[in-house]
UniProtKB/Swiss-Prot annotation:
Interacts with TTN/titin. Interacts with YBX1. It comes from the Eukaryota. Induction: Down-regulated by doxorubicin (adriamycin), in vitro. Residues 55-89 form a coiled coil. The lineage of its organism: Eukaryota, Metazoa, Chordata, Craniata, Vertebrata. The keyword Lipid biosynthesis does not apply. The gene is Ankrd1. GO terms for biological process: cardiac muscle tissue morphogenesis; cellular response to hypoxia; cellular response to interleukin-1; cellular response to lipopolysaccharide; cellular response to mechanical stimulus; cellular response to transforming growth factor beta stimulus; cellular response to tumor necrosis factor; cellular response to xenobiotic stimulus. Expressed in heart, cardiac muscle. It is found in: Nucleus. It comes from Rattus norvegicus. Keywords: ANK repeat, Coiled coil, Nucleus, Repeat. This is Ankyrin repeat domain-containing protein 1. May play an important role in endothelial cell activation. May act as a nuclear transcription factor that negatively regulates the expression of cardiac genes.
Length: 319
């Protein structure tokens, strides 16, 4: 079987040795090859059946007609709003589409940390501060004391109460942590809870028997601490639990003295509403009202000074 090249089929010519070989460009000059190829293409088009072209056009036309009919049906279905029920159905369908589109992100719960190695005291105290319950549980499960403390005698319970880590507070108390353990400034867990401002921890301590009247080295009660740090809910709960409104610290100040000095309006109103004494004098002989007047006079003196300086500057500017 002989193999012919395209050029031989188109022109009907062969090379000099009469067999299918390398194409000789010298045999076709002045565009003879291009003309032969163009002629062959025209002959191919002539050989195509005439009805095949017509069939392709008819198919395209029929597809266009079908698309137009489908669009028309959709528009007719949309326009058929005979009553309110049809409108409600459409609204519900749109809502369902929206719900399908919005994917609710699945939040994976962190795997529980498994502690196998022994936990030392510094790591245990740090875990209580940073809310790392598995570390605390491992330390306690190894029969260690929950009342170990740092150089300032602050225990894990003090730290957890400050940060409001309720689960750790519960775990420490289950292990026998002392609620009335005092740090270097003689603050107890209830002082630290009010300093941190966590109401749930404060409630837990009181329910477990924490002394509401406990005082630190400055003779401050938990109510003093709550007022100074501005934790309104803690102060309100302490008052509801019958904390002493007029308890004096080492300087003779009551919680109301502290509230006035720090200009905590909500605390002042809270204490006065529940009957705090306005006439109690501190060690300097000042009542809460005296502090208000002193603050007003001090503020008035500052404004008078500023006003006088502004007047002097204006006089200098005129000369």
């Amino acid at each position: 079987m002989m193999v012919f090249r395209v050029e031989e089929l188109v022109t009907g010519k062969k090379n000099s040795n009469g067999s299918s070989g390398e194409f000789l460009p010298g045999e076709f000059r002045n565009g003879e090859y291009e003309a032969a190829v163009a002629l062959e293409k025209q002959e191919d088009l002539k050989t195509l059946p005439a009805n095949s072209v017509n069939l392709g056009e008819e198919q395209r036309k029929s597809e266009k007609v079908r698309e137009a009919e489908l669009k028309k049906k959709k528009l007719e279905q949309r326009s058929k709003l005979e009553n309110l029920e049809d409108l409600e159905i459409i609204v519900q369908l749109k809502k369902r589409k929206k719900y399908k589109k919005t994917k609710v992100p699945v939040v994976k719960e962190p795997e529980p940390e498994i502690i196998t190695e022994p936990v030392d005291v510094p790591r245990f105290l740090k875990a209580a501060l940073e809310n790392k319950l598995p570390v605390v549980e491992k330390f306690l499960s190894d029969k260690n004391s929950p009342d170990v403390c740092d150089e300032y005698k602050r225990t894990a319970l003090h730290r957890a109460c400050l940060e409001g880590h309720l689960a750790i507070v519960e775990k420490l108390m289950e292990a026998g942590a002392q609620i009335e353990f005092r740090d270097m400034l003689e603050s107890t867990a209830i002082h630290w809870a009010c300093r941190g401002g966590n109401l749930d921890v404060l409630k837990l301590l009181l329910n477990k028997g924490a002394k509401i009247s406990a005082r630190d080295k400055l003779l401050s009660t938990a109510l003093h601490v709550a007022v100074r740090t501005g934790h309104y809910e803690c102060a309100e709960h302490l008052i509801a639990c019958e904390a002493d409104l007029n308890a004096k610290d080492r300087e003779g100040d009551t919680p109301l003295h502290d509230a006035v000095r720090l200009n905590r309006y909500k605390m002042i109103r809270l204490l006065m509403t529940f009957g705090a004494d306005l006439n109690v004098k501190n060690c300097a002989g000042k009542t809460p009202m005296d502090l208000v007047l002193h603050w007003q006079n001090g503020t008035k003196a500052i404004f008078d000074s500023l006003k006088e300086n502004a007047y002097k500057n204006s006089r200098i500017a005129t000369f």
